UniProtKB/Swiss-Prot annotation:
Expressed by the venom gland. Coiled coil: none annotated. It is found in: Secreted; Target cell membrane. Gene3D superfamilies: CD59 (2.10.60.10). The keyword rRNA processing does not apply. Its main location: secreted. This is Cytotoxin 6.
């Protein structure tokens, strides 16, 4: 089973490579309404003072 994650424009998605079993969205903390990055990832990154990550593990959940 391979996960499908949305690209930055959610009309498009990609099939994740093996081992990358999470979808993620990355936001700037200053603007939490517009994601700056979306895609596949293996481990959810830690949030920082500037950047917030939202990760999930179902198809196109990002």
């Amino acid at each position: 089973y391979t996960l499908k994650c949305n690209k930055l424009v959610p009309l498009f998605y990609k099939t994740c490579p093996a081992g990358k079993n999470l979808c993620y969205k990355m936001f700037m903390v200053s603007n939490k309404t517009v994601p700056v990055k979306r895609g596949c990832i293996d481990v959810c990154p830690k949030n920082s003072a500037l950047v917030k990550y939202v990760c999930c593990n179902t198809d196109r959940c990002n």
